[in-house]
């Protein structure tokens, strides 16, 4: 265990220091590069390993060796700089299903000092347009199928091999990725100098009020994540199956950066299908899966069929994040798959992988825990009402601090000030406690995001749409528990007098305006929405009302 000040007295068991009410990580400290002009792509490429195959496309079998990967990164970066004109600080959007070339694009863009951002492929054209208006990308990497969702006249590089003529003339295609990968570099190596404090990545994190916000992550933030990833007890010869979306922080940090530095092989599924995943495990003798909790539940429910059809003897580890696993789910999985270890973790988009995780099956059997603090992370538990710092086994809002914590929100200083204080503490919005052994437990969400199958759904966005309906006076959206999805959006609606508005009409009204994962799936009508004196919706009262009928 390492501490920032020698004078601190820290309990070696819990990691807690009474003098400053701070919990410290019990893991080994990170070794970060002192060179302030070393970008994260260079840091990743400099890591020694003996890995040969970096990525495999599960659908086609196409492979990228590590030599192929770094050759492609160099060539794409050269094309972007000399032919497209991408420069330091420019924003490049990736709108694409999972692909073995997403890591190539991310690493190329960051090597130039440019910033990559992503969008959910399920989002509507309206939702994507709002994000584009905020981030103002210079260029978009996308597929022929997804290109029509983009605003007209935006520059596009196609990530598939479809011909130009199949696209509407309003879309300005400036390149095809497969051609960029084949093109020999120009030999002109002059590029903009990159500083570690420069922004490298901007992922959009949904908020409970107003529009989603672009989370700004620097080269230093991502370097800290990669350094932590390779320092964890991971086997370099692991073969991972990537089922999580690579437009999300989990997929990007793990499979576009972490495993590349580690030298592991990753088999990428373009989209998740349970039996496609199992087929990939058997075919490629995969040893590790990274999953969201609903997939774990599906594996339990279909265990007999899965084990009868597929050889999963190579599978050793399942890594699960997004929500704490219950004792019932953990025990149910271990009963069905006794030779597979479950490892859990906790992090936020704003923490870039910093948070907590379990690194052994024994730790994961401490039911409900997200693990112990990751390397170089400090934590505080704060009373959300008084602001008082709490101690061991006391519940309050979790604050995190460390080298991977985001710089803040893009063009939103107010939100940045509310979330990250002047000392660099990230207020997570999650109600947690840390026990006498330093294990973090997530009790509840102070933040009101609904997590549907790993996707974040902001209630305020759906409420804003609901009240535009001519027959709706007021509305509130809450998370409704579901065994398969984790949660789904449920609406409480106040109808106008004499209105005969039905549940189906409300559901249909919303479904036409949002991505599939944001759809409202249950509606209840109510006389009034319970609110505080200041007008804030009392969601907990509505959640209690909804779940009391279960």
UniProtKB/Swiss-Prot annotation:
Q: Does the keyword Transport apply?
A: no
**SUPFAM superfamilies per the record?**
Acetyl-CoA synthetase-like
Q: Which GO terms describe its molecular function?
A: ATP binding; CoA-ligase activity
Q: Which cofactor does it need?
A: Mg(2+)
Which Pfam family, just one, is annotated for this protein?
AMP-binding
Q: Please tell me where CoA binds in this chain.
A: 271, 453-454
Q: Which residues bind ATP?
A: 205-209, 213, 344-345, 349, 430, 445, 536
Q: What is known of its domains?
A: Both substrate-binding domains (SBD1 and SBD2) are involved in the substrate recognition, and are sufficient to confer the substrate specificity.
Reported function: Contributes to jasmonic acid biosynthesis by initiating the beta-oxidative chain shortening of its precursors. Acyl-coenzyme A synthetase which exhibits a high activity specifically toward OPC-6 ((9R,13R)-1a,1b-dinor-10,11-dihydro-12-oxo-15-phytoenoate). Also capable of activating sinapic acid, a cinnamic acid derivative. Follows a two-step reaction mechanism, wherein the carboxylate substrate first undergoes adenylation by ATP, followed by a thioesterification in the presence of CoA to yield the final CoA thioester.
Q: In its UniProt entry, what is this protein called?
A: OPC-6:CoA ligase
Q: Which organism is it from?
A: Arabidopsis thaliana
Coding gene? 4CLL4
């Amino acid at each position: 265990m390492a501490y920032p000040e020698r004078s601190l007295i820290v309990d070696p068991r819990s990691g807690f220091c009474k003098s400053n009410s701070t919990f410290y990580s019990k893991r080994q400290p990170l070794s970060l590069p002192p060179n302030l002009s070393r970008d994260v792509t260079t840091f990743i490429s400099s890591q020694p390993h003996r890995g040969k195959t970096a990525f495999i496309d599960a659908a086609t079998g196409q492979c990228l060796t590590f030599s192929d990967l770094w050759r492609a990164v160099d060539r794409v970066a050269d094309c972007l700089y000399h032919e497209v004109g991408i420069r330091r600080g420019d924003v490049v959007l990736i709108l694409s299903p999972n692909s073995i070339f997403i890591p190539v694009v991310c690493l190329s863009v960051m090597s130039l000092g440019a910033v990559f951002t992503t969008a959910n492929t399920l989002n509507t054209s309206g939702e994507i347009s709002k994000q584009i208006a905020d981030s103002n990308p210079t260029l978009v990497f996308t597929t022929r199928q997804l290109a029509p969702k983009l605003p007209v006249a935006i520059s596009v590089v196609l990530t598939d091999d479809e011909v130009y003529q199949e696209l509407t003339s309003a879309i300005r295609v400036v390149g095809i990725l497969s051609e960029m990968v084949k093109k020999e570099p120009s030999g002109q190596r002059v590029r903009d100098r990159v500083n570690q404090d420069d922004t490298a990545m901007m992922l959009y994190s949904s908020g409970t009020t107003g529009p989603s916000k672009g989370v700004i992550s620097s080269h230093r933030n991502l370097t800290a994540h990669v350094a932590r990833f390779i320092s964890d007890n991971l086997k370099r010869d692991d073969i991972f199956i990537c089922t999580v979306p690579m437009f999300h922080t989990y997929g990007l940090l793990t499979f576009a950066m972490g495993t590349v530095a580690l030298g592991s092989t990753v088999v990428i599924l373009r989209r998740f299908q349970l039996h496609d995943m199992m087929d990939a495990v058997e075919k490629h003798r995969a040893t590790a899966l990274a999953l969201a909790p609903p997939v774990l539940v599906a594996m339990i429910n279909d265990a007999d069929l899965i084990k009868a059809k597929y050889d999963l003897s190579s599978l050793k580890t399942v890594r699960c994040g997004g929500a704490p696993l219950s004792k019932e789910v953990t025990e149910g999985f271990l009963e069905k798959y006794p030779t597979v270890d479950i490892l859990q973790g906790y992090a936020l988009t704003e923490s870039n992988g910093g948070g907590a995780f379990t690194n052994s099956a024994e730790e994961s059997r401490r039911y409900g825990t997200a693990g112990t603090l990751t390397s170089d992370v400090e934590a505080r538990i704060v009373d959300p009402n008084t602001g008082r710092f709490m101690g061991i086994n006391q519940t309050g809002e979790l604050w995190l601090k460390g080298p991977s914590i985001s710089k803040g929100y893009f063009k939103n200083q107010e939100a940045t000030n509310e979330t990250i204080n002047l000392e660099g503490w990230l207020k997570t919005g999650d109600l947690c406690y840390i026990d006498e052994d330093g294990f973090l437990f997530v009790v509840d969400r102070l933040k009101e995001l609904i997590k549907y199958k790993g996707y974040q759904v902001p209630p305020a966005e759906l409420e804003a749409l609901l009240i535009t309906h001519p027959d709706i006076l007021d509305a509130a959206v809450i998370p409704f528990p579901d065994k398969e999805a984790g949660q789904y959006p449920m609406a409480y609606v106040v109808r106008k007098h004499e209105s005969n508005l039905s549940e189906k009409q409300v559901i249909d009204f919303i479904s036409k305006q949002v991505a599939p994962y944001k759809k409202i799936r249950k509606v209840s009508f109510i006389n009034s929405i319970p609110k505080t004196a200041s007008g804030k919706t009392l969601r907990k009262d509505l959640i209690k009302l909804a779940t009391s009928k279960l």
